[in-house]
Amino acid sequence: MDLNLRGRTALITGASKGIGIASAECLAAEGVNVILVSRTQADLDAARARIAGRHNVTVEVHAYDLSDSRNVDRLAETHPDIDILVNNAGAIPGGDLQAITEDRWRAAWDLKVFGYINMCRRFYAEMKSRNRGVIINILGMAGEKMDRTYIAGSTGNAALMAFTKALGGSAGDDGLRVVGINPGAIATDRLITLMKTRAQSQFGDENRWQEFMKPLPMGRAGKPEEIGAMVALLASDLSAYTSGTIITIDGGAANRGPMF
């Protein structure tokens, strides 16, 4: 299916790995020119080579830490005319209330929670001036299925869910759309590394990590490209009446028992 996205431009944060690069690839496959943002230049260079080698689109990269709002300003000044913004940067540490110090909590939220808010503030204004644009916030299932052992992440994602709904609810008045995606367990490098560490600790064999996937819906974690495909669909005009809502992609896990 042609999503009629060819020639548009998307800026994706957290774009060098996992859901970020999968989203960039799915958009590039539809002919979207992509701007990749993450903190590590080497990873960005690899991502650029990968996408440019597979798709006939323009690929630009910026190594920025988006917990610093000055870098958000730099991006908006350099790329004021983007059509699609995909917020994906940020990893919030696990742990209960006593395990996460104030400094760790604030640092994590500066990147993900306030990073998303700052990106939306700047790029929403630019899009509004042109009366068109789509913002897609990649959130996390912990925002709807609360977990005391991931309290900073659950609270942060819940806050961003509310933010996305509040902003997207009236975005149509400005010619824009704002939507969110709540991924469940997704087989990113980060998740696989965590599961290998757990398998080594529990079984003495990191290669048994896939055994932890069996309790998940359908007996597996989701694939990054399954999130990327939804990003492309939501970015397209096929989703022109979709705004102020959150799409959960977790195989049904939010309505089951514990994942692990």
Descriptions of predicted regions:
Residues 172, 177, 242-244:
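Short, small/polar-rich loop/turn modules that mediate ligand/substrate recognition or access, typified
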Residues 1, 6, 19, 145, ...:
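Short C-terminal tail/terminal secondary-structure segment
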Residues 125, 169-170, 240:
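Alpha-helical segment proximal to the catalytic Tyr-Lys
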Residues 30-46:
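Conserved glycine-rich Rossmann-like NAD(P)H-binding loop of the short-chain dehydrogenase/reductase
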Residues 120, 156-157, 164:
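Active-site helix of classical SDR
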Residues 96-97, 104-109, 212:
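Substrate-binding pocket helix/loop in short-chain dehydrogenase/reductase
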Residues 100, 146-155, 166, 259:
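Active-site loop-to-helix junction immediately N-terminal to the catalytic Tyr of the SDR YXXXK motif
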